[in-house]
């Protein structure tokens, strides 16, 4: 067993290599943690935007239903007015034919 300077230098070299590998792994893990935190923030923002979009879609759906109902009633009123005008016109023609 040699315990001279060469053995100590080899041991120190291996220790330094191991320390360098540990430092590299630590740096990689820090980068990964930063990426995970950034991803979490982006997901949170995306979730907030999705909630806002859902609320907007729900409001649009309600407004569209009200508008559909409003124009359905307008259409019914126009039909009623058209039928009334037609009936009055027919009555006028009948009265004119009978009185002639």
Swiss-Prot record:
Give the family per the record: Belongs to the synaptobrevin family.
Q: How does it sit in the membrane?
A: Single-pass type IV membrane protein
- Example of a GO MF term: SNAP receptor activity
Q: What is this protein called?
A: Vesicle-associated membrane protein 3
Q: Which taxonomic lineage is given here? A: Eukaryota, Metazoa, Chordata, Craniata, Vertebrata
Query: Which residues are annotated with the PTM N-acetylserine?
Result: 2
Topological domain, Vesicular: which ranges?
99-100
Localization recorded for this chain is:
Early endosome membrane; Recycling endosome membrane; Synapse, Synaptosome
Q: Which UniProt keywords apply?
A: Acetylation, Coiled coil, Endosome, Isopeptide bond, Membrane, Protein transport, Synapse, Synaptosome, Transmembrane, Transmembrane helix, Transport, Ubl conjugation
């Amino acid at each position: 067993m040699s315990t001279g300077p060469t053995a100590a230098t080899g041991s120190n070299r291996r220790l330094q290599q191991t320390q360098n590998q540990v430092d590299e792994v630590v740096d990689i893990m820090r980068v990964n943690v930063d990426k995970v935190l950034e991803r979490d923030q982006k997901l949170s923002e995306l979730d907030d935007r999705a909630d806002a979009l859902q609320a907007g879609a729900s409001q649009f759906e309600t407004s569209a239903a009200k508008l559909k109902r409003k124009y359905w009633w307008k259409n019914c009123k126009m039909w009623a007015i058209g039928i009334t005008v037609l009936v009055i016109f027919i009555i006028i023609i009948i009265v004119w034919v009978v009185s002639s």
